[in-house]
Amino acid sequence: MLSSWQKKFFQTPEHPPAEGIAPPRDDGVPNPEPVTYPDTKYPSDVVNHDAGEMLPNEEAQDGVTQAEAITLTWSKISLGAAYFLMWLLYLVNGFQASITGNLSAYVTSGFESHSLIPVISIVSSVMSAATYMPLAKVLNLWDRSIGFIIMVAFATLGLILSATCHDIGTYCAAQVFYSIGFAGIIFSVDVITADTSTLRDRGLAYAFTSSPYIITAFGGPAAAEHFYDSNWRWAYGCFSIVLPVVALPMFCLLRWNRHKAKKSGLLKDKADSGRTWMESIRHYIIEFDILGVFFLAAGLVLFLLPFSIAGSTEDDWKSASIITMLVIGFVCLLVFALVERFVAPVPFLPWALLASRTVLGACMLDVCYQIAYYCWFNYYTSYLQVVYGTSITTAGYITSIFDVVSGVWLFIVGFLIKKTNRFRWLLFIAVPLYILGVGLMIYFRKPSWSVGYMIMCQIFIAFAGGTMIICQQVAVLAASDHDHAASSLAFLNVFGTMGSAVGSSISGAIWTHTLPGALQRLLPDSVKADWQTIYDSLEEQLSYERGTLIRQAIALAYASTQSKMLIAGTAIMALSLVWMFVIRDIKLTKTQTKGVLF
C-alpha cells in the first residue's frame, strides 16, 4: 500500500549513482565528467556542473538563469552592496517586528479584543503560507526583483492600513497584507542569498543577513514603549516610509546588473510566448494554481479559527457558526486535496520534493518547531507584564533574547558547518536542548519564581532554535539543485508557517477555554462580576497594583494558562526527536551557483 501511494504522489524513487568517480577540483580547472563523492549515495549529491563554465544555465527557469547571469556579471563591490542592502532589509524587518509585536497586545486591547491575538496570527500565518509557492514561481518564472518589489508593495500597504485603522476588522485585514509582505520580502532575500553564496558558506551568509536582529532586540522594545506613550499609529506609519526607501536600492541594484548581463550577451531576450491577454491570464491562473491557493487558505482559516474563538461564543462548541466553520473548513481542505490530485495541471506544492527524506525531515522538523513555539509565544509578553510586573521595554528585551543570542550563535553555527561540511550533527544537540528549555519553563512559570529563570530558559531556546532554523534551510538547499532552490525554500516556509498557524490555534484554544474559568475561580468576590472586562484588556489587568489580591489572582490565572500552553508545546516538540533522524547527513561539497559569490 505504501509503495502504491508513493507511485501516485511522487515521481521516481531515489537510485544510487555510480561510485568511484573523482571529486571535483576547487582550483577552477574543469572536470571532464560528472562527479560524485565517495560518501554520497543519492542523486542530490551528484555534481553535474562543469566547474569552469562561465555561462548561465539556459535550460533552467528564467528567474534562475537571470540570477546566474547577474552573479556572473557583477563585481565584488556589487556583491558587497547587495549583502549590505539585504542586511538593511533584515534590520527594518527586525525593528518593525519587535516594535509592533510589543504593541499588538495594546492595539487589540484598545479595540477591546485582546483575546483575538491568536485569531489575527492564524489568519496572517495561513495567508502567508498560501503565498510562498506562488511567490517562488514568480521568482523562478519571471525575475527575483519582480517578486521582491511586489512583496514590498504588500508590506507598505499593510503598514499604511495599520496606521490608519479604527476598528479591529480593518486592523486584521492590515495585518494580513503586512504579514504577507514582510514574509515575502524575507523569503525573497533568502532566495537571493542562496543565489549569491556557495553551499558551504550558505550558513554564514544567512547568519550575516539575519544578524541585525542583535541590534533590533535592544532598540525595538524601547522604541515600542516610546510609541505607546506617544502614538502607536506612528509605529506603523514610520515604517511605511522607511521600507520603500530601503527596498528600492536593492531593486535597482538587481535590475541594473540584469541590464549589464543582457548588454554583455550573457542574458538573452525571452522569446515571445505568442499568447493573447486572455490566454496569458488563463496560463498564469493555472501556473500559480489560484484554485488550490483559495481552497487551502479558506480551509485552514475556517478549520483553525473555531479552536480560538469557540470559548468566547455564547454556546461554545454548540454554536451553529462554530460548527459551520469547522464543516466548511474541512470540506475546503478535502476539495483542495482532490483538486491537487486530480484537477490541477500544476499543483500548489511540488509534492515530488517529499520523495527526498531530507526535505521531508526538515519540513516536519520545522512544523513541530513552529507549533511548539507558537503554542506559548503569542501571549508571552502579556504574561511577563502581568505575572512579573515588567515594563513593555523589559518584556520586549526578554522576548528578544532569542534574537540576540541566536544572532551571535549563528555565526558560530555557520563556521562549524563550513569547517565540517556537515550540518545534521548540530541537530542532535539543538533538538534536545530546545525541549529542555521549553520543559523548564513549565516548572518556572509560577509567580513565586524569579524572572531570571525564564531568561535562562530563553537562552537555551535561543541556542537551540537558531541552530535548527539554519540547519533546516541548509538541509533543503543541499537536497536540491539551484533550479529548485526557491521551490525548496518555499516548501519549507509553507510547512513552517502552517505550523505557526496550528500553534496559534492551540494557544488561542487554551487561552479562551482556560483563562476565563481561572479568573472566575480565583478573583475576589468584589470583582468577580468584572472578569470579562479584565479578560478582554491587558491595560485593565495591569491597572491593579502588584501585591493586591486581585493582581495575584490574575497572575495565578495567567500562570495556570501558560502552563497548559507550555505542556502542549513540549509534547509536540518531542516528535522532532524522530524527524532529525530522517534527515540525511549530506556532505556540503556540491557546486550549485556560479560567478562572484559570498
Swiss-Prot record:
| Phenotype reported upon loss of the gene | Impairs FsC-mediated iron uptake.
What are the inducing conditions?
A: Expression is repressed by iron.
Topological domains annotated Cytoplasmic: 1-76, 137-144, 193-203, 255-289, 340-341, 418-424, 472-490, 584-598
Membrane disposition: Multi-pass membrane protein
Spans through the membrane: 77-97, 116-136, 145-165, 172-192, 204-224, 234-254, 290-310, 319-339, 342-362, 397-417, 425-445, 451-471, 491-511, 563-583
Q: Listed GO cellular component terms?
A: plasma membrane
One example of the protein's molecular function in GO is:
transmembrane transporter activity
Q: Which UniProt keywords apply?
A: Cell membrane, Glycoprotein, Ion transport, Iron, Iron transport, Membrane, Translocase, Transmembrane, Transmembrane helix, Transport
GO terms under biological process: cellular response to iron ion starvation; iron ion transport; transmembrane transport
In this protein, the residues bearing a glycan are 102
One protein family per Pfam: MFS_1
The keyword Acetylation is annotated on this UniProt entry? no
Q: Where is this region: Disordered?
A: 1-34
Q: Which InterPro entries match?
A: MFS, MFS_dom, MFS_trans_sf
Keyword Glycoprotein assigned to the entry: answer is: yes
Where does the protein end up?
A: Cell membrane
EC class, as a word, reads translocase
Annotated EC: 7.-.-.-
The residue ranges for the Extracellular side of the membrane come to: 98-115, 166-171, 225-233, 311-318, 363-396, 446-450, 512-562
Q: Which PANTHER family match?
A: MAJOR FACILITATOR SUPERFAMILY, SIDEROPHORE IRON TRANSPORTER, PUTATIVE (AFU_ORTHOLOGUE AFUA_3G03440)-RELATED
Function, as annotated, reads: Major facilitator transporter involved in fusarinine C (FsC) uptake. In contrast to TAFC-mediated iron uptake, FsC-mediated iron uptake via mirD does not play a significant role during infection.
Q: Which family does it belong to?
A: Belongs to the major facilitator superfamily.
Name the UniProt record assigns to this protein: MFS siderochrome iron transporter D
Q: What is the lineage of its organism?
A: Eukaryota, Fungi, Dikarya, Ascomycota, Pezizomycotina
